[in-house]
């Protein structure tokens, strides 16, 4: 299964660690989206910055 992660809130004012997680997910600018495999690793990264991103399932 794949998931689409979209940056919906600016990381300005949040910790450096959360900004690094967003960068490692491949999210840079507001509104940018990436598609990832639904793995425990990716789920943990999303959990760290859940207040900044929107997640939706994608049909393969």
From Swiss-Prot:
Stored InterPro entries: Ribo_uL30_ferredoxin-like_sf (IPR036919), Ribosomal_uL30_bac-type (IPR005996), Ribosomal_uL30_ferredoxin-like (IPR016082)
GO molecular function, one term: structural constituent of ribosome
PANTHER family tied to this protein: LARGE RIBOSOMAL SUBUNIT PROTEIN UL30M, MITOCHONDRIAL RIBOSOMAL PROTEIN L30
Organism: Desulfitobacterium hafniense (strain DSM 10664 / DCB-2)
Database matches in SUPFAM superfamilies: Ribosomal protein L30p/L7e
One of the Pfam families matching this protein, by short name: Ribosomal_L30
One biological process term in Gene Ontology: translation
Protein's UniProt name: Large ribosomal subunit protein uL30
NCBIfam families given in the database record: rpmD_bact
Cellular-component GO terms for this entry: cytosolic large ribosomal subunit
Keywords for the protein's UniProt record, in alphabetical order: Ribonucleoprotein, Ribosomal protein
């Amino acid at each position: 299964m794949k998931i689409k992660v979209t940056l919906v809130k600016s990381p300005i004012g949040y910790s450096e660690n959360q900004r690094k997680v967003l960068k490692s997910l491949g999210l840079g600018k507001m509104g940018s989206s990436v598609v990832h495999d639904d793995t425990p690793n990716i789920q943990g990264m999303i959990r760290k910055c859940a207040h900044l991103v929107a997640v939706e399932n994608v049909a393969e």
